[in-house]
Amino acid sequence: RQMCIRDRNNSVGKQGLNGWIFALLTLDTMGYKTPEGAEFDRERILDEIVSSQNTDGGFSLSKGESDIDITAMALQAIAPYYNDFSRDDVRKSVGKAVEYLSGKQDSSGTFGSAEADSQVVIALCSLGIDPEADSRFVKSSDLLTAMLSYQNSDGGFSHEKGGDSDELATGQALCALAAQKRFELTMRRIYDMREELSVLQREKLDGINGRLSDISDEESAEKALKLFNDLDCDERTYVRLSLIHI
């Protein structure tokens, strides 16, 4: 399958950074290949996203102050490339963006709205980071608990606490809950719509992911790296290397 990313104005990013973000997410939904010589291939789109990062680690829709939602969305798009050792710029970009988001979370654990919390939950799950347990995102409560505090008695979510339920906040919260569940079950990322990982693939991934926390010296790191290299390329992107520094 091939997909050609283009638009009438020959600029995917005319609307802003989210144009590049959704272009990459679209390509990766089914692992589409871009035609040889395409102007907007994966490398070009990745370059555009990473080069747009602000000095504080965040991203913005266009040039200006970093935005929590856009930063989280950028992470969702580039997360599948974190384990690509040929793209050290992606790994550094992810690290800075995660640090930026951690610093923007308030003392109660929220980012200020149901939508922002939802987008960050999706981003963290895409990176293999647990929103309920990672110390960078646990303040007086964890991020997932903070997001759920926006849910009303009618089942919907509100933009602000105490507000009326609305479709946008509820829809994004549902996506975040789905992302969290898929993370817990070692399933594909929410925007990865290829055939689901098999039971055997999930068992292999759970095995290597469980070893990552035990890496304490060069020998244990080499053993983990061998297990990583033994995986199919399709599986490697789901190894949670973002939890360690290699």
Region roles according to the model:
Residues 39-44, 88-96, 136-142:
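Short sequence/structural elements of tandem HEAT/ARM alpha-solenoid repeats
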Residues 1-5, 246:
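Short, small-residue-biased leader/transition segments that mark boundaries at the very start
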Residues 2, 22-36, 73-87, 119-133, ...:
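Well-ordered alpha-helical scaffold segments within catalytic/enzyme domains
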Residues 143-146, 161-200:
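Terminal, non-catalytic domain-edge segments
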Residues 194-244:
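Beta-rich interaction/scaffold domains
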